[in-house]
Amino acid sequence: MKKKVLSIFLVMTLVLTMLTGCGGGKEASPEEAANPNKLTVWAWDKAFNIYAMEEAAKIYQADHPEFELEIAEVGWNDVQTKLGTIVGSGNYDQLPDICLMQDFAYQKYVITYPDLFLDITDSGVDFSQFAAGKVSASVVDGKNYGVPFDNGTAIAAYRTDILEQAGYTIEDLTDIDWNRFIEIGKDVYAKTGYSLMSTQAASSDLIYQMLQSAGVSTWNEDGSVFFTDNEVLKQCVEIYKEMADAKVMQIVNSWDEYIATFTSGKACGTLNGCWIMASIQTATDSAGNWAITNYPSLPGVAGATNYTNQGGSTWAVTSNCKNVDLAIDFLNSTFAGSSELYDTILPGAGALATWLPASESEVYAEPQEFYGGQQVYTLLSDYSSKVPAVNLGVYYTEANAALYTLLANVVAGADIDAELQTAKETVEFKMQ
């Protein structure tokens, strides 16, 4: 009898223990459960994109104090690698809620991997309030796949104190062509030991900037590769080679080295998208000794201008977003709806808005002491309105890679025509 009572007692104890474990105990800790007020983001460039996203979070938190934002710094090359790995494995759980995408590559990702990003056409974002040319970078088959962010209008920025040592002013580098640029660059180098600009080896961005300044594409209207018989492209490569040989332009390997050339090294200028101003402004010891102007034009080319574009990016909501409504409301309330945000990140990072209402702010007309009192944002707004349109193509990334291989070979002494033919064949193979 005692054994029977003991058995019943043990069974009851076991049942009570199981009940406690299954539902009678405490609930999962907040750390164990998904945070409904948190978004994760992938972005690159601490001084620009990440800074802008952090400022957007502060503004959103004013009305949503429970909101949290976790930003992972992921370089653009790493973003591409990660996306490729995720698509290959089918494990979309590794995606963040929001991912920054380069404009020149975004359409290809949407077309090639339709399950990666969300269609936000009917999300409530007013896309008519963005520059039409900017919006088009994230539109596929009439549907919107992102919230536009920065303007990539190109600038030429120079150290005026170094130019002065060689006998030049910013006006001497305004409205000039590449022939005059090289002439001045040789003189500046001879007198000061400073190159007029620098570039990164594994990049053909400079070539694309030159081409767009004249409205010339690397693609024919039927989508085929336009490398050979493209006399303007050949001219751009010749200019690149001449500048490298004459030490008018430094060529370095990494992005960090590129930034260092003009913030602490021996380049007294840089030509890039206006977003580069965020990196220029990290050189606080040279504050007041910088000025910006427009871009050199291609000599002898019909339709050539002193205006071009480089880059620009878009915020995309991924298919793995845990809280789509929160992500949309956050982006709509900040990058698509806050003048305060753009008033902050414009002087803070040189983030020129493509959200049109932001340009009405008085901040745009304020003199910037870092640039010697220039009204730089008024200049940028003017430049952006004069940039020629150009077709970058769905296979921009493949063309870009082929061209920077070409540039390395040409600088080393290879024949330009032969390299253009090889690059054309390389891109055509990758398009198959």
Question: What kind of region is each of these model predictions?
Answer:
Residues 62, 66, 138-206, 217-254, ...:
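Helix-loop-helix "hinge/cap" segment bordering the ligand-binding cleft or interdomain interface
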Residues 77-81, 215-289, 293-298, 325, ...:
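Extracytoplasmic ligand-binding clamshell segments of periplasmic binding protein
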Residues 99-155, 179-184, 190, 209-211, ...:
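Hinge/lid segment of periplasmic solute-binding proteins
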Residues 107, 276-286, 299-401:
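C-terminal lobe and pocket-closing loops
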Residues 34-46, 67-72, 97-98, 145:
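Short, well-ordered beta-strand elements
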Residues 59-130, 165-167, 266-269, 283-284:
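Extracytoplasmic "Venus flytrap"/periplasmic binding protein-like
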Residues 1-40, 62, 418-421, 425-432:
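Short, low-complexity disordered leader/linker segments with a strong preference
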Residues 118-130, 173-175, 196-197, 216-235, ...:
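Short, solvent-exposed loop/beta-turn-alpha elements that line the ligand-binding surface or hinge
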